[in-house]
């Protein structure tokens, strides 16, 4: 956050945040309201939600939704972390892909026909057409997402400028702490769910406010969220589905339904199920997203109605500092998308999916807590934060 503010000289900062389920196809560690508090306490001025229909998607769709929201809020610059760290290289890579589009598409098809996943095929195609040091490594996950952010800016004819910060020490998929001060989200999550885990081990790697709020969530609700807690629900759902039922679920295609129904029979945990399910063609993340859609019963028809090829249909405001509130007041007449401060009276196909996802997310809670949290999610007004006193209002 400090590096972003230093690099962009921003007046205010806006974060677009996933809701209950994340882009890599897993439940968020804590609710979006607690994560909003974390963001505000760390210096963000406005926190808005990226709808489920965009947030649990491949990088291209995820980026398109996020950029459309930022564009609607009249953001002048975005900043993202990347393995490359040189923004010029992203623009060079986009230019090469555009100029070599026919060759690129042919290579992607060729590598997919050889049994590779789309992500792997795309990475291999880039390796073949990108030879200059001025291009980015498209096998790296944060480079891929940054590439899609900039493509979305260009596709939406936005005047937004992009900046990037190089990731140091820890890599996206690292499962262990390799540095004294920097750790990947993957390694932090693994530590939190390890035997005899405590928050002490992760405290050097996260802000104090984040550590405090994580501990508070676990104390108040008795749990942090991961896939294993949902596995019994997930397995039960699959045991009651036919291949035809499963084919209606978003991202279930090319016979994947038969493999899923076969592997679930002998799986005793989500991790063992994923180990049995993954192949060269289907990456772990791609499969986790498909499993998330099964868990939330998100169908192809629902995603079609959400019209994800277009821009996000609304802005769900989750939290704001005093500076953020002032910014919204000054610019609200220019913002063309509806800004939702709660969702109890608004209706849209995209919001219908969000409501289902929230319901599933809280399903692991005991009653009456589950019902209370679900009701609060619809009626919850944006969290307000006084940055001068560092207190929530």
Swiss-Prot record:
GO cellular component assignments: cytoplasm
Enzyme class: ligase
Entries under SUPFAM superfamilies matching the protein: Nucleotidylyl transferase (SSF52374)
EC number, as in UniProt: 6.3.4.-
Catalytic activity: cytidine(34) in elongator tRNA(Met) + acetate + ATP = N(4)-acetylcytidine(34) in elongator tRNA(Met) + AMP + diphosphate
GO MF term list: ATP binding; ligase activity, forming carbon-nitrogen bonds; tRNA binding
Subcellular location: Cytoplasm
Residues binding ATP, per UniProt: 81, 142, 167
Principal place of residence: cytoplasm
UniProt cross-references to HAMAP family, sorted A to Z: TmcAL
Similarity remark: Belongs to the TmcAL family.
General function of this protein: Catalyzes the formation of N(4)-acetylcytidine (ac(4)C) at the wobble position of elongator tRNA(Met), using acetate and ATP as substrates. First activates an acetate ion to form acetyladenylate (Ac-AMP) and then transfers the acetyl group to tRNA to form ac(4)C34.
Protein name: tRNA(Met) cytidine acetate ligase
Lineage, highest ranks first: Bacteria, Bacillati, Bacillota, Bacilli, Bacillales
Name of the gene: tmcAL
């Amino acid at each position: 956050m400090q590096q972003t503010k230093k690099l962009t000289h921003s007046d205010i900062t806006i974060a677009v945040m996933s809701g209950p389920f994340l882009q890599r196809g897993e439940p968020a560690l804590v609710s979006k309201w607690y994560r909003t508090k974390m963001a505000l306490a760390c210096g963000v001025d406005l926190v808005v939600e990226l709808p489920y229909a965009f947030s649990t998607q491949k990088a291209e769709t995820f980026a398109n939704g996020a950029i459309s929201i930022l564009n609607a809020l009249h953001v002048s610059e975005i900043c993202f972390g990347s393995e490359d760290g040189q923004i010029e290289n992203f623009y060079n890579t986009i230019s090469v892909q555009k100029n070599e589009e026919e060759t690129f598409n042919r290579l992607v098809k060729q590598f997919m026909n050889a049994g590779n996943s789309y992500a792997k095929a795309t990475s291999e195609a880039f390796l073949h057409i990108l030879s200059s040091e001025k291009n980015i490594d498209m096998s790296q996950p944060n480079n891929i997402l940054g590439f899609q952010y900039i493509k979305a800016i260009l596709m939406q004819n936005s005047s937004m400028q992009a900046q990037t910060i190089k990731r140091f020490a820890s890599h996206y998929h690292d499962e262990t702490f390799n540095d004294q001060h920097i750790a990947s989200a993957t390694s932090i999550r693994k530590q939190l769910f390890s035997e005899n885990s405590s928050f002490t081990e992760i405290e050097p790697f996260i802000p104090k406010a984040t550590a405090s709020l994580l501990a508070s969530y676990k104390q108040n609700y008795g749990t942090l969220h991961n896939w294993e807690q949902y596995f019994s629900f997930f397995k039960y759902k699959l045991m009651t589905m036919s291949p035809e039922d499963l084919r209606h679920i978003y991202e279930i295609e090319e016979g994947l339904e038969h493999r899923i129904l076969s592997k679930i029979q002998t799986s005793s945990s989500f991790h063992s199920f994923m180990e049995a399910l993954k192949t060269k063609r289907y990456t772990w993340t791609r499969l986790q997203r498909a499993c998330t859609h099964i868990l939330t019963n998100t169908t192809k028809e629902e995603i079609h109605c959400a019209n994800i090829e277009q821009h996000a249909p609304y802005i769900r405001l989750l939290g704001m500092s005093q500076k953020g509130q002032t910014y919204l007041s000054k610019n609200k007449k220019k913002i063309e998308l509806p800004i939702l401060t709660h969702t109890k009276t608004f209706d849209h196909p995209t919001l219908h999916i969000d409501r289902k996802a929230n319901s599933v997310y809280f399903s692991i809670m005991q009653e009456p807590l589950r019902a209370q949290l679900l009701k609060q999610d619809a009626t919850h007004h944006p969290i307000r934060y006084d940055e001068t006193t560092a207190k929530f209002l």
